[in-house]
C-alpha cells in the first residue's frame, strides 16, 4: 500500500492565506479575460516581472547559463537559482499563492556569492531531506548543502579545475551515497586549443573512503549529460551530448554503460554514430510505446530520435515529427537556429507532451540566426508537433540558455522560466484557457536517495500509459527537482503505480485528478 503524507485534494490553506503582493496589470488582465477571449486549449503565457538578473561574461560563458528549480525552504513552492557567469548567481524565492499571479523576491544567500558560474543542479547529495546545489563553474565546482531555509553551506568537494558545463547524478544499486558525473568543455590549459582540445569527463562513485574519480575519455566537449534507465532494466547509463564545434571530426554522441568498469556502447551493441552541435538532452515517452524518445538540441535541426528495438539503436525523426525547429519561425532571419535547453511538459493538460526549446546565437556567429525566437512545440493528436511559441507569447528574441517548465503557483499549469545571455531572466505565467485535468506526483524515500532518483511513475488514463523517470541531469547546465506533472485531458480519475529505485512495481491504485499527490516509500 502507498503511504500518502501530504495527500491533498484542495489547495494548501496556509499558502492560500499568504499575502499576494501587488497584482501585475499584465497578468491580472489576462487572468480576467483569458476564458472569454482565447480559443479553447490554445496555449497562452503572460510575462511576470521578476528581480533583475543577467547571465553575462566572455567566451567562457558563451555556453552555460543554467537554471536550477528546487523547493529550498519546504513550503512546496518552487524557487529558482540562476547561474550568473561573470555576475553572481541569484536565488529567487517563490512568494506566489495558489492560483494567483506568480511573485518572487531576491533572497540570494552569501553562499552563492560565487564567480564564473555556468550552471546549477539540485539534488539531495547528503540524504538529509534538504535539497543541495551542485554549482558548475569555469574553475573548481562548488557543492552547497541546503539547510532547509534557502541558505546553504559549502561542502567538502574537490573535482579539479575544469570548465564544467554538465552534471548528472543517480544512486546505483546497493549504494547509499550518490554517483555523479561532471561534463567538461574545452581544456583551457591545452596550448593547442580551443579546437580539438576537448577535456575529459569525470565519474565519481562512492567508496568506503569517500567518492573516487573515474576519468571518462575520450571527451568530446560535453554540454549535457544524463543518467537514464533507457533500457528500463533498473540500471541507469550515462548519455552525453557533445559539441561538434570543438571536437570537429573525431567526436560523437556517447552512451556509457555503467558497468563495474564503465564502457562506451559501440556498433557491436547496436549503437550508431551521431554527430551534432549537442547542447541539451531531454527524454520522454512521447508516443506511449514504453520507450523514451531522446531529443537533442543543436545548431540547425533539433534531433529527435526514436529507439529501435531493445538495444541502444536510435532513428532520427525530427522532420517526420515536426520537431526539427531548424530556422526561426517568425521574423526575416532565415539562417539556422541555435537550440540550448529542451523541456518537455504538457502546457495545456490535454494529455499530450509539448516541448519548449530555448534558442539564441552563441554570441555573434554569422552563419546562424541572431533573431532566433524560443520554440513552443505543441503535441498534436497524430504524434506530430506544431509551433505555437508566438501564439503563446514566449517567442523571446534574447539569447536564451537555461530554462524550466514547472508549476510555479500550484494551479496545475506549467509555467516557464528562462535564463538569457546578456539580457534579463524572464518568467511567464501559464494562463491557458480551459485546460485539461492534471496530476502532480512527488516521491520521497527515507534515509537515502530521499528524492527517489531512478524511480518510474506510470499513470494510466484508460487510453494510454504515461511513464516518467525521476532523474537528475540533462537539459543545458540546469535542471528541476520536484514533483512530476502529468496532463490528463478529460480524465477525472486515473490509475497510478510506482517502481521505486531498484525495487518492484507497486500495485495499481485509482486516484482522483487535479491534485498534488505526495508518496513516501514504505
Language model features: what each stretch is:
Residues 49-87:
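Beta-strand-rich domains and repeat architectures in extracellular enzymes and scaffolds
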Residues 46-58, 109-111, 267-272, 317-333, ...:
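Surface-exposed loop and turn segments in beta-propeller and other repeat-based domains
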Residues 38-45, 88-107, 140-155, 192-212, ...:
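Beta-propeller blade repeat segments, especially FG-GAP/WD-type strand-to-loop junctions
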Residues 37-38, 42, 46-57, 152-154, ...:
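Gly/Ser/Thr/Pro-enriched helix-cap/hinge segments flanking short amphipathic alpha-helices
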Residues 77-84, 131-137, 178-185, 237-242, ...:
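Hydrophobic beta-strand segments that make up the repeating blades of beta-propeller
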Residues 58-62, 110-114, 157-161, 215-220, ...:
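Surface loop/turn motifs at the tips and blade-to-blade linkers of beta-strand repeat domains
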Residues 151-153, 159-258, 262-282:
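Solenoidal tandem-repeat scaffolds enriched in leucines and small polar residues
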Residues 64-72, 93, 117-127, 131, ...:
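Beta-propeller blade termini
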Amino acid at each position: 500500500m502507498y503511504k500518502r503524507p501530504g495527500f491533498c485534494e484542495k489547495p494548501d490553506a496556509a499558502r492560500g492565506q499568504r499575502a499576494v503582493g501587488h497584482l501585475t496589470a499584465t497578468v491580472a488582465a489576462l487572468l480576467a479575460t483569458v476564458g472569454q477571449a482565447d480559443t479553447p486549449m490554445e496555449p497562452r503565457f503572460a510575462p511576470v516581472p521578476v528581480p533583475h538578473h543577467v547571465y553575462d561574461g566572455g567566451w567562457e560563458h558563451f555556453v552555460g547559463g543554467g537554471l536550477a528549480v528546487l523547493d529550498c525552504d519546504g513550503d512546496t513552492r518552487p524557487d529558482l537559482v540562476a547561474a550568473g557567469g561573470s555576475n553572481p548567481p541569484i536565488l529567487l524565492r517563490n512568494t506566489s499563492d495558489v492560483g494567483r499571479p506568480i511573485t518572487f523576491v531576491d533572497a540570494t544567500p552569501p553562499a552563492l556569492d560565487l564567480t564564473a558560474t555556468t550552471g546549477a543542479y539540485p539534488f539531495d547529495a547528503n540524504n538529509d531531506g534538504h535539497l543541495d546545489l551542485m554549482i558548475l563553474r569555469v574553475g573548481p565546482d562548488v557543492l552547497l548543502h541546503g539547510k532547509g531555509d534557502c541558505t546553504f553551506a559549502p561542502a567538502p568537494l574537490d573535482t579539479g579545475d575544469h570548465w564544467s558545463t554538465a552534471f548528472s547524478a543517480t544512486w546505483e544499486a546497493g549504494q547509499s551515497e550518490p554517483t555523479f558525473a561532471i561534463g567538461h568543455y574545452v581544456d583551457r590549459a591545452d596550448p593547442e586549443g580551443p579546437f580539438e582540445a576537448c577535456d575529459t569527463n569525470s565519474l565519481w562513485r562512492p567508496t568506503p573512503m569517500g567518492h573516487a574519480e573515474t576519468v571518462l575519455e575520450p571527451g568530446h566537449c560535453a554540454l549535457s549529460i544524463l543518467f537514464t534507465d533507457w533500457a528500463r532494466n533498473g540500471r541507469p547509463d550515462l548519455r552525453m551530448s557533445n559539441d561538434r564545434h570543438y571536437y570537429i571530426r573525431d567526436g560523437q554522441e556517447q552512451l556509457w554503460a555503467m558497468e563495474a568498469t564503465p564502457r562506451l556502447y559501440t556498433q557491436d551493441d547496436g549503437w550508431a554514430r551521431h554527430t551534432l552541435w549537442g547542447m541539451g538532452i531531454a527524454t520522454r515517452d512521447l508516443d506511449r510505446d514504453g520507450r523514451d524518445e531522446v531529443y537533442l538540441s543543436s545548431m540547425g535541426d533539433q534531433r529527435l530520435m526514436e529507439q529501435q528495438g531493445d538495444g541502444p539503436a536510435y532513428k532520427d525523426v525530427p522532420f517526420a515529427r515536426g520537431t526539427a525547429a531548424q530556422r526561426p519561425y517568425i521574423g526575416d532571419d532565415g539562417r539556422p537556429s541555435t537550440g540550448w535547453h529542451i523541456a518537455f511538459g504538457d502546457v495545456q493538460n490535454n494529455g499530450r507532451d509539448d516541448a519548449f526549446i530555448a534558442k539564441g546565437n552563441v554570441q555573434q556567429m554569422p552563419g546562424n540566426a541572431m533573431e532566433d525566437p524560443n520554440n513552443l512545440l505543441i503535441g498534436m493528436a497524430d504524434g506530430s508537433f506544431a509551433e505555437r511559441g508566438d501564439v503563446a507569447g514566449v517567442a523571446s528574441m534574447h539569447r536564451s540558455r537555461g530554462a524550466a517548465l514547472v508549476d510555479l503557483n500550484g494551479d496545475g499549469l506549467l509555467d516557464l522560466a528562462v535564463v538569457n545571455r546578456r539580457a534579463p531572466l524572464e518568467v511567464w505565467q501559464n494562463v491557458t484557457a480551459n485546460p485539461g485535468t492534471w496530476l502532480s506526483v512527488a516521491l520521497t524515500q527515507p534515509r537515502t536517495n530521499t528524492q527517489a532518483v531512478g524511480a518510474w511513475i506510470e499513470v494510466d488514463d484508460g487510453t494510454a500509459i504515461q511513464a516518467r523517470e525521476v532523474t537528475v541531469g540533462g537539459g543545458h547546465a540546469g535542471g528541476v527537482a520536484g514533483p512530476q506533472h502529468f496532463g490528463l485531458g478529460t480524465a477525472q480519475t486515473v490509475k497510478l503505480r510506482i517502481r521505486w529505485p531498484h525495487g518492484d512495481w507497486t500495485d495499481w491504485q485509482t486516484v482522483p485528478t487535479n491534485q498534488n499527490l505526495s508518496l513516501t516509500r514504505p
